[in-house]
Amino acid sequence: XDEAAPPPAATAPXAAXTE
């Protein structure tokens, strides 16, 4: 069910850049 609830990083790639 990963597709049902993907990680926040996948939804907001920009967040990864911020980290």
From Swiss-Prot:
Gene (name only): PSAE
GO cellular component: chloroplast thylakoid membrane; photosystem I
Family, as annotated: Belongs to the PsaE family.
Gene Ontology biological process: photosynthesis
Oxidoreductase found in the keyword field: no
Membrane-protein topology: Peripheral membrane protein
Location in or out of the cell: Plastid, Chloroplast thylakoid membrane
Function: Stabilizes the interaction between PsaC and the PSI core, assists the docking of the ferredoxin to PSI and interacts with ferredoxin-NADP oxidoreductase.
Name of the protein described by the UniProt record: Photosystem I reaction center subunit IV
Species this chain originates from: Cucumis sativus (Cucumber)
Alphabetical UniProt keywords: Chloroplast, Membrane, Photosynthesis, Photosystem I, Plastid, Thylakoid
